């Protein structure tokens, strides 16, 4: 059943990144979204992506999500309509899921590096501690995860679909046998999660 799941209007894809940098994310594990579906999300869609990606981090990777809405600006350091969209998405996401730790707008270094986060976004519980990265567009997401995968030698597992009533996932045409194995394991995990939720 590829129909949307209840409460969600759209389908999004996120990438599980297993990096060799344990100082980032949860022991090197990061979840990034949306990397393959929505080219230019509006603020509401970006908020949905943030909430869905956080839920995926919980369900698939066992991560207590610390969500950063990424931008080229940190806490008003730049003014632009794209930044305004991220700020609006943060407000919507906090209303949608007040239980999720989320902040933005944050530059990638402010989201991931504690010293930079403390300098650029003092007082933020997410800055320097993010393990879920929400990018402002598909272009940014797709380029970012592939750069991390290829230049950083990270394992990129996914894309993992969310917002669908049953587990359905996708693989890149450049995937390996190991990638297929990991996606099968994730689909099984998603299926078990659905049965447990009933």
Task: Describe these PLM feature segments.
Residues 125, 140, 145-198:
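Internal helix-turn-beta structural module
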């Amino acid at each position: 059943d590829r129909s949307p799941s209840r409460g969600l209007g759209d389908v999004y894809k996120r990438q599980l990144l297993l990096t060799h940098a344990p100082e980032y994310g949860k022991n090197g594990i990061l979840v990034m979204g949306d990397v393959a579906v929505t080219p230019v999300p509006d603020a509401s869609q970006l908020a949905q992506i943030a909430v869905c990606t956080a839920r995926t981090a919980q369900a698939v990777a066992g991560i207590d999500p610390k969500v950063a809405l990424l931008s080229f600006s940190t806490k008003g350091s730049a003014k632009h309509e794209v930044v305004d969209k991220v700020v609006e998405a943060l407000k919507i996401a906090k209303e949608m899921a007040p239980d999720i730790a989320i902040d933005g707008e944050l530059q990638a270094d402010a989201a991931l590096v504690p010293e930079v986060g403390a300098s650029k976004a003092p007082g933020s519980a997410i800055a320097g501690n993010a393990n879920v990265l929400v990018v402002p567009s598909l272009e940014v997401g797709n380029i970012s995860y592939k750069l991390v995968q290829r230049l950083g030698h990270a394992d990129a597992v996914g894309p993992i679909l969310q917002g669908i009533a049953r587990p359905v996932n996708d693989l890149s045409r450049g995937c390996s046998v190991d990638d297929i194995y990991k996606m099968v394991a994730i689909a099984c995990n998603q299926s078990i999660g659905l049965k447990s939720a009933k």
